[in-house]
Amino acid sequence: MLTEFRLLQFFMTHPDFVYGRQHILDMVWGRDRYLDERTVNTYVRRLRNKLEAMSADVEFVSVRGVGYMFL
């Protein structure tokens, strides 16, 4: 849950920009940790589900071959 919060906080403070998975991993989890880039996919999916359940007026947009952006 804390990681989801940090991920959401990162995107909310950097809206409208596309970020690659590796950059997101470095900024949210730290550069000193080795995690698969698909970890980001899992956490973004969880946040998407929670935001949709709340009918939030924001969304994560997947940019194929690049990463994600938050609108």
What are these regions (language model features)?
Residues 2-42, 46, 50-59, 64:
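Positively charged, aromatic-enriched patches within helix-turn-helix-type DNA-binding elements
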